[in-house]
């Protein structure tokens, strides 16, 4: 979807039994063309290899080894098109002890530590939709890898395999916080740090109309403006978090 939005001509290969009738309301299908194919049919595979000779990128999301069994693995495809960028998306990577296991976003971000960092301290970790593993650590990392591979291919005429695993991508997104912890600037435990709900000026509050407001007044000048708008007269910065959080909640 992202590459199509950027202008790429994307052709989706769908199972023959679907007849290419994936939901027109699924945003992931926008800006794409769809063809159907029986990948277990040798003649069909040969037709796809002829198509692969003409394209810049192939990417797939099967479990490790499936494309090889179908006769469409990276070695075969790169032999057909030496400039090809071959993208692969899995949950746990192409090899390793967990590579053949099933999984979902919540599993990948659980292992990477992202899930444990989100939520209130007196509750269980809160699943943040499937934004971190599937999209941020998965699709967006793969899209960046593919674009980088294309630049390399354009400059060198050499294709390559781009291997993207959602568990690796979500761990990469956590690298800043792990570096803060190593430097002594991040504490274990939810609601213990500036960006995880500890700071009263970076949090959400329920308003009198039963809707919610998100406050992000980290910088002193914005914090001063926040106090002014809420008619809170404390002049010392920083002040008692507990004291001001109570005043801020009351103001909303």
Give a label for each model feature:
Residues 9-13:
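Short beta-strand "acidic-cap" motif of Rossmann-like dinucleotide-binding folds
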Residues 23-29:
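Conserved N-terminal glycine-rich FAD pyrophosphate-binding loop of Rossmann-like flavoproteins
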Residues 31-78:
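A structured beta-alpha segment of the ubiquitous adenosine-cofactor-binding alpha/beta core
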Residues 246-252:
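A short, hydrophobic C-terminal helix/tail in secreted or cell-surface proteins
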Residues 2, 6, 70-213, 217:
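Active-site-adjacent "lid/gating" segments in soluble enzymes
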Residues 15-21:
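Short glycine/proline-centered loop/turn elements that form peptide/ligand docking sites
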Residues 196, 201-245:
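Aromatic-enriched alpha-helical interface/lid elements that frame and gate functional surfaces
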